[in-house]
Design a protein with these regions (language model features):
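Mixed-charge, low-complexity intrinsically disordered segments
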Residues: 240-263
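Short acidic, glycine-rich loop/turn motifs
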Residues: 9, 96-100, 123, 270-276
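Switch/communication elements of ASCE P-loop NTPase nucleotide-binding domains
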Residues: 1-66, 275-359
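Short acidic/polar mixed-charge low-complexity motifs
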Residues: 15, 101-105, 115, 128, ...
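A generic "structured core" feature
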Residues: 65, 264-266
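A short catalytic or substrate-binding loop motif that flags glycine-/basic-rich loops and adjacent residues
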Residues: 1, 87-90, 258-262
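Conserved P-loop NTP-binding catalytic core
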Residues: 41-42, 55-107, 112-116
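Electropositive, glycine-dotted interaction segments
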Residues: 106-246
Length: 359
């Protein structure tokens, strides 16, 4: 089982002081779930209240971790401190407490534009006592030979602007590789405002993953989107379909890059009925032309949603309710709160303005 328990940031964009998003049941009635963490967390607030920056902070932490292996010695790091106080010259801090393969860890680091200032990794016992696996500060990197042997003798091989965890993973450290994998495979971050990027992923799941496709289609029927089915059509690239008035250089570039490639079109299936309500035939229509913006968004993010549910992942969605009817947003949330559907302990964290989702 994998899960997110707490995310902490300090001195990032609009967050000057240390703030934490807590998803554990530490102060809640644990009887409300069979698992010790929240399946759903909604972040409410007015515009410019920092909701999106919290999601952006996790995205930034994830980016630094996954790209640290590519950072050259002396190369600047991503760094956006709070600019309206003397903290503008201090490091930004990121920390994540999480469950990975049923074990709990606390990993974090702080950085400015030039270097990793601090970095730490702890294993957390069931009684909440902590075992330091390694600690990095201005004096160097201290590694536990007993509890983190894969990091021994690698301390001096780490550049100032590179994460120690990343180096150990690159050199084959098993736990370090698992933690890097947790950030790359178990955490997904979506924008609810720009969902076009997820269309291909959702279409591929409909086309190739029959079990997932059945779940997605059943969900579409349950929320009564108006179509009876959704299908895909694969086509070879046809240069003749390019507009006649397209600039010749652009046309040549597209032909060069796309010849031999296939495109996937999404079609919605609608029933045609007679005056007595009897089905006469089914007709297919281009999905992006016939359906509403809310329906298109729901389909576009349905792939990541069901991938998260089936794999027990963690999904962050900024502006979940944008362009979508409140009832559709509520049904998406219910997928995660219903333990008969969310059998793998997947988590949904989202920002919203819709207080109706509180119910």
């Amino acid at each position: 089982m994998n899960a997110l328990l707490r995310f902490t940031i300090e001195n990032f964009r609009s967050f000057a002081e240390r703030k934490s998003l807590v998803l554990s049941h530490t102060s809640l009635d644990e009887s409300c779930s069979s698992q010790p963490f929240l399946r759903v967390c909604a972040l409410y607030g007015a515009n410019s209240s920092g909701k999106s920056n919290l999601v952006n902070a996790l995205a930034r932490m994830r980016y630094i971790i996954l790209n640290s292996v590519k950072v050259n010695d002396g190369e600047d790091l991503e760094y956006e401190p709070f600019l309206l106080s003397d903290k503008k010259n201090e490091p930004t801090l990121y920390e994540l407490e999480f469950i990975l393969s049923d074990k709990q860890y606390r990993y974090g680091f702080s950085n400015d534009s030039k270097k990793i200032v601090q970095e730490w990794l702890y294993c957390v016992n069931p009684n909440n006592s902590e075992i330091p696996l390694f600690i990095r500060d201005h004096e160097g990197i201290g590694v536990s030979e007993k509890d983190f042997p894969e990091g021994v003798d690698m301390e001096e091989r780490t550049n100032d602007n590179r994460l120690f965890l990343s180096l150990v993973a690159q050199l084959g450290g098993s736990l370090a590789k698992k933690i890097i994998g947790f950030f790359s495979k178990s955490i997904n971050i979506l924008s609810g405002l720009e969902t076009d990027d997820y269309l291909t992923f959702s279409a591929r799941m409909i086309k190739e993953e029959k079990n997932v496709a059945a779940l997605m289609k059943n969900f579409f029927k349950r929320v009564q989107l108006g179509f009876s089915d959704v299908t895909t059509r694969t086509q070879d690239f046809d240069a003749q379909s390019l507009p006649d008035n397209m600039p010749e250089e652009l046309k040549k570039l597209l032909v060069s890059n796309l010849t031999g490639k296939k495109s996937v079109s999404i079609l919605s299936v609608h029933g045609c009925y007679d005056s007595e309500g009897n089905l006469m035939e089914n007709r297919t229509f281009p999905f992006d032309e016939m359906e509403s913006e809310g329906t298109k968004k729901l389909f576009e993010i349905s792939g990541p949603i069901f991938d998260t549910l089936l794999e027990g992942k963690i999904l962050f969605v900024d502006e979940l309710d944008a362009k979508m009817h409140p009832l559709l947003s509520r049904e998406l949330v219910r997928l995660f709160t219903d333990e008969s559907i969310n059998t793998e302990g997947a988590q949904l964290i989202f920002t919203t303005h819709d207080t109706n989702l509180l119910s």
